[in-house]
Amino acid sequence: RVFFYVQHLLGIGHLRRAATLARALAAGGFDVLLVSGGAPTEGLALEGVRFHQLPPLRAADAGLKVLARLDGTPLDEAFRTDRTHRLLDLFRAEQPDVLMTEQFPFGRTQLRFELLPLLEAAQDLPSPPWIVSSVRDVVRRSASPARVEEMVATFEAFDVLLIHSDPALVRFEESFPAWDEVKTRALYTGYVADADPAHTPHGEVGRGEVIVSVGGGA
């Protein structure tokens, strides 16, 4: 049983990657609960995956440092407390074998108010789950050495770091300076993508061409 937490703040790339991973886990025989804290998204493929929507929030701006409700209202302590309680109650009811956090603690540190209690709840279970961090190929660089140290310290609670990248193309240490502190528990998985849909080429249109999408959740 897998409890998979994901929070998208601006676009939906993080959510779509998490959904792809969740579907693959479900297809492999895992009972997966995907828990999303971002805006509800129509058309999200979740075959075989259970889904739970937390009270949604988003980034107030492109800087991602300030969080807000979907209507732009700043978060208050009551909202944070309520959402944290909902998350912890759900987690304790699930009693998962694996807890996965998308990006955290190497990103989404704005969500410490609920994710640190979640880690504590996991460690307090009679049979603590494996705790896994699932990250994309590049993480946002922190200008603060103290923040990097905090990430490393928080990662002590984790069993493994899954890096969804090909090290021959992009290496995690290129964007995370404290690689030496986490590398013994890190695994490269390769990139996460859905299988190519079946299609029939339409004549010569597009033949020999490549379309590149930058920033869409690869």
Give, region by region, the residue ranges found by the protein language model.
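N-terminal subdomain of nucleotide-sugar transferases
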Residues: 1-39
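Conserved hydrophobic helix-helix packing surfaces used for dimerization/oligomerization
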Residues: 1-2, 99, 210
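Conserved nucleotide-sugar phosphate-binding/catalytic loop shared by glycosyltransferases and other
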Residues: 24-78, 84
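A short helix->loop->beta-strand "cap" motif at the edges of active sites that frequently abuts
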Residues: 30, 123-131, 158, 183-184
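Conserved nucleotide-sugar donor-binding subdomain of glycosyltransferases
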Residues: 67-112
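Glycine-rich phosphate-binding loop signature in dinucleotide/nucleotide-binding domains
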Residues: 90-96, 126, 204-206
